[in-house]
């Protein structure tokens, strides 16, 4: 039988079995062939079991981003194994083998007509070089061997350190380099090490040109546009303005277009669960067949190496919540869901109008954007035709070759050099002398009674309507009564302009020079001297003085003026002064208010405080309300102002507006309306807001040229303590901007809200200061009664309390929950602020201020930015971080004009650093500094030159504070990984991890976060696993703003209270025991701190009970130690 089978069978050349053979995985040292299974002739049962085994296995994505040294060693072992296998047996070797190999290599490098990669059957696409955009560049254009050309103009010099280059060579994208010859790798590495970074920025020696203009009208438009960004960051008190939302200028169409492109690039066809299972099984079957056939034998060995490396380098972040013992478990991690909105009803007419804004402002903004986007083809300077004709560019007067700190950033905010003698405008001021004007004020009639009350009581509440004279006269009465002999007479004002103007007026009434007997102290300016007796200042300045002198020994009397505004600093000062009054019986505290809420102030100071009311108003004011609700408050205010101006009555006009953009639009519309009329009388339109330069602010107090009428357009800065001579007409739209803390984004937001009834009455009183006036309210009488709050919500109840907590801790307040606030903030907000400061390292485990916290108090920044600056000095990158913090303190520096969005985006691509938006800001500033701070360079690259100038000023100010704190200014060169780690040290609490393609989630809260299309990380083709962001902007999605890629290890190192790394050796029990030991250690520290606090409290109580330390006898005419002048620096 066997012989018959042999006769009909063709014998093979070797003793191998035929048919489908499934080989087992080779075992080292075993060369025995695999025996076929006896159960199935073709081995189908084994194949089916193998298939089921693979089907049960779960595929894991290889997220490893780098090839480390261990992987390279594994690859080299594979190469050695294959070389050893090839050396076995007998081989034929020719002497001409090397020569032929060189010949073959040269043939491969030089494409011939017969062989190559190009398709000969079709037409070749011509290649056009467009060197302006990186998307149209060849990827290796600047790195080709033997190329002597300069880098392209788009490739800005983004510094890269040796660490970055090495990390890229070890990444998955360079795995093919492992298969090159050793000589090729050595040569490439040598070229990389000795390659010098070339600066692709054009030389700026020739480029010192100012934008040319066709006529004077165009120059005026350009100058007007530059004013729009003037003083945007001063005095906004760290608030986020909706007008300067970094994503506000980005159109919805652009966002949808970029996101659609990204989805089309990354979106996969949707499959059902059954289809996915079938597809997965087919892939496993194909891979198995390829592996068995020997085609991809090495891929299996390499994949095993990568799997081992993935398991080795994969970092798992564990989220935890450690609560310090001083909070006693009272922390609430879910912050307040909705911000406190200071309106009666969010659906009322005025609230809806405030949220919608002005239509006239929106239309004018669009027109300005179109003008800005207009390409000026008539300009010949710098063009090819202009070069042929010899037209040269004008010298750029804005270019500044000096260093960052060469200019005096304080000059533009100092009022003393711009203040002139006030000239009388109204008949009342021109006909009466200063003495007669003082005696005409209502406060003069009750002067003696008021001073008797002040002498008999330490705390007095004085209520007087606007214009009664309490601000200017009260300090002079105290001086005349002898209070200036034993110390200073201080008077606080809520705003800088108010402090400056009142000091100017009091100096004129006393007949002394400003800065001598009467002076003022505001931010960036201290206009006082050794002779100063009456000192006007902002409430923030007095709060800062409490840091150095908790008892305020240099003051004999303090006047808290305009206390009804209830600013944040005012409420904190009330709590501190209450403690000071209890310790000092010789200190007089006078609280003045223009509203009838004196009982609240009296109850706060013990209930025994007398209340003195100044009767009467200076001049009557006629009140007019709108008949119907107004749709556009800007357009209505402009029409009313033109109507008043064209009427027969004399007197200046005061118009209230919410913000800077509304003010600028109102001024321009008034000028346009009057320009359309024939023979219209002249009108001087003057804006005033806190961001305006001091020289322009001072113009409102001066007489208009030619005696023409003035129309002053102001924010609520003109509500209190600001007397402009000649104001007889007031136009009140009924809106203002207020800071409201939004816990979701973690910062304050400046938004437009309806004013309160008390503020409306204050605005009405502005018309009756120097004569009978009229007030036009652009809202109905019903809206005044039903849609306006009785009084303004205190700022302390609607703002971020982190800076307040930090300041109170620096003042020695141990238990903040027991601190005396007139209107205590929500306890949850206070506890959350304390918890945030503890996570930043400003508070220790016992709730006391740390050395880092004391340094953070000195910076007028958010605590997070202060932490970043302090950590940068320790990490050796303070110069770079100082620039980044300064860039974050100003509005958006990029702009996208309509019609030229793509060109602006292409320019922006030059500056983007793929790992970080923060580093992109740093790169922009470095390039601007390289171009000698040129304004033309900013215009060419679609950058706001005014915003960058403010960055220089902020940087100089912060640098001065760092020098005072002995923090070194160090630059780390091109090692920007250290900068990213420093950013992570401050924003680790805003960390997000990758969830899907283009989608992140907050590591702690799970809130979805998305990259905005304008981010440098959007669409770069590589999504980092972890990022930190500056803030969340709530628009169509929860977009992250200012994103930086970080490593997971950094989060665990810099934020141990939130994150920890899971180690394979640690069990769950060991992790729990470790957390218990941490809590026990903190509780032991808290017990020791409580004992120390009790001991200090007992000592302070004993010292307070001693009569010799609590009372002092002061002789009349003697100088006290409190009169010693201390050097003061502003906020």
UniProtKB/Swiss-Prot annotation:
Segment forming the signal sequence: none
Residue interval(s) of motif DEAH box: 561-564
Helicase ATP-binding domain boundaries: 451-614
GO biological process, one term: feminization of hermaphroditic germ-line
Protein name from the UniProt record: Probable pre-mRNA-splicing factor ATP-dependent RNA helicase mog-1
Domain of life: Eukaryota
GO cellular component, one term: spliceosomal complex
Disordered: region residues: 1-225, 389-416, 1085-1131
Entry binding sites for ATP: 464-471
Family under the similarity heading: Belongs to the DEAD box helicase family. DEAH subfamily. PRP16 sub-subfamily.
E.C. code: 3.6.4.13
GO terms of molecular function: 3'-5' RNA helicase activity; ATP binding; ATP hydrolysis activity; RNA binding
